[in-house]
A protein has these predicted regions:
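Alpha-helical transmembrane segments and their membrane-interface boundaries
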Residues: 1-87, 109, 113-178
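Histidine/lysine/aspartate-rich catalytic loop segments that bind and position anionic ligands
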Residues: 96
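Membrane-helix boundary/interface segments in integral membrane proteins
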Residues: 99-111
Length: 178
């Protein structure tokens, strides 16, 4: 459980740090995140065992939506702080937010959720990341940029869940039918 949670929590940020050539990795420099992950895993295991509680996939989408927003905002801000061009900062925000979950699903032998259900996920991160970039261009305070970006990505994801939004699915051979 700790390994899978660690991949989900740190995978996207680690890839971002590799791509930005940032050392040490954020979770090495700030080991408190490792301790927090371990503590949360212990609490989750105790809670699940004591209560015989099995959270549904739908229930787990809410904290995931919040994480998507927070990781998008911070990942984009880190790339901006590294003086990356706007489009690179946006992509780094998306990588930070999405790649950990992709790693988690692959390790669990599942098709990554970000790719399988056609609900907006990465595109929510894309929109939130642009909020950070635009706020920076407008000289908005950093805290406001992060809050607005996290709120945008989270809200879009929550709306996608609640309203069952889907993106068009590519169908092999669809062009041949035309």
């Amino acid at each position: 459980m700790v390994v899978v949670a660690g991949l989900a929590a740190f995978g996207g940020g680690t890839l971002r740090d590799i791509l930005l050539d940032r050392r040490p990795f954020f979770w090495v420099e700030h080991a408190v995140w490792l301790w927090l992950l371990l503590a949360l895993c212990i609490v989750a295991m105790l809670f699940l065992r004591a209560r015989h509680f099995a959270p549904t996939e739908r229930a787990m989408q809410w904290p995931d939506a919040l994480g998507l927003g927070l990781f998008t905002a911070t990942g984009t801000q880190i790339a901006i702080g590294a003086e990356m061009p706007a489009i690179v900062a946006v992509l780094m925000g998306m990588v930070t937010a999405v790649f950990g979950g992709v790693l988690r699903d692959i390790v669990c032998n599942e098709i990554p959720r970000a790719f399988r259900d056609h609900q907006p996920y990465a595109i929510c991160a894309f929109a939130g990341a642009w909020v950070v970039v635009v706020a920076k261009a407008l000289d908005a305070p950093q805290w406001l940029a992060l809050l607005a970006a996290a709120g945008t990505a989270t809200l879009l994801r929550v709306l996608a869940i609640q309203l069952s939004w889907t993106l068009p699915a590519w169908r092999p051979g669809a062009q041949e039918e035309m």
